[in-house]
């Protein structure tokens, strides 16, 4: 049975939800792992969905945060320049096209420059509101980014539907009191309110009084 949500706005994660940047992430973070004597698989298991400095703090708990921020800045520059293999996830172009003129925001752990580069490389339009890493004080799973996105669109958190593929992103939506749709096969393990195998399984219909009907499945 399809899941149906009636909301006023959508809050969208980027990497893994709209954009497939997995090849770049694997290249950059595998180099990080080798630099620090870590197993690449162990690093890649925790990197997804959060800001780089937060991942480094988890992997290198004894290292000063200043060093994490410095290395993260270098890696962000590397990732922004490396767009080889960055493509839209299935259904993303049509999904975003269906949102034209409707309230929606991008809420990503990527920097503004990285987000714009990956969206452009994927030929995807930028949402009217973007909440990027520079605009929050805490990375997902903290709900700050989603709460900021809801506020900037002018809606209460419970009136917004989140789309996420990562465990920390689903947790952030939950912490913010927002319903959440998991996107992609691995999202099922994180307990979203509904699961879309791809964005091809999602339809958004604008109704009266600014209400959006979102059907998943």
Locations of regions flagged by a protein language model:
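Residue-level marker of regulatory loop/turn positions in helix-turn-helix DNA-binding domains and
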Residues: 88, 107, 138
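N-terminal helical cap/lid subdomain that shapes the substrate entry/recognition surface
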Residues: 3-94, 100, 111-113, 124
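Asp-based, Mg2+/Mn2+-dependent phosphohydrolase catalytic module
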Residues: 1-8, 111-217
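A generic structural signal for short
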Residues: 17-18, 84, 104, 134-135, ...
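Glycine-centered short loops/turns at secondary-structure junctions
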Residues: 101-103, 177
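N-terminal-biased segments
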Residues: 103-107, 121
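Hydrophobic residues in well-ordered beta-strands that form the structural core
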Residues: 20, 106-108, 182
């Amino acid at each position: 049975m399809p899941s149906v949500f009636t909301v006023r706005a959508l809050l969208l994660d980027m990497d893994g939800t709209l954009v497939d940047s997995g090849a770049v992430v694997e290249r950059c973070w595998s180099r990080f792992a080798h630099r620090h004597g870590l197993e690449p698989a162990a690093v890649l298991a925790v990197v997804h969905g959060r800001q780089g400095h937060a991942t480094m703090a988890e992997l290198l708990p004894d290292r000063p945060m200043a060093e994490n921020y410095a290395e993260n800045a270098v890696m962000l520059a590397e990732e922004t320049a490396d767009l080889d293999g960055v493509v839209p996830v299935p259904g993303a172009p049509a999904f975003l096209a269906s949102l034209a003129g409707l309230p929606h925001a991008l809420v990503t752990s990527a920097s503004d420059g990285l987000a714009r580069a990956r969206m452009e490389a994927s030929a995807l339009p930028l949402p009217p509101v973007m909440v990027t890493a520079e605009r929050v004080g805490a990375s997902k799973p903290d709900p700050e980014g989603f709460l900021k996105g809801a506020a900037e669109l002018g809606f209460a958190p419970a009136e917004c539907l989140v789309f996420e593929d990562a465990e920390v992103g689903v947790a952030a939506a939950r912490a913010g009191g927002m319903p959440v749709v998991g996107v992609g096969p691995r999202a099922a393990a994180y307990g979203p309110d509904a699961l879309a195998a791809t964005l091809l399984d999602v339809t958004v219909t604008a109704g009266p009084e600014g209400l959006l009907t979102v059907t998943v499945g």
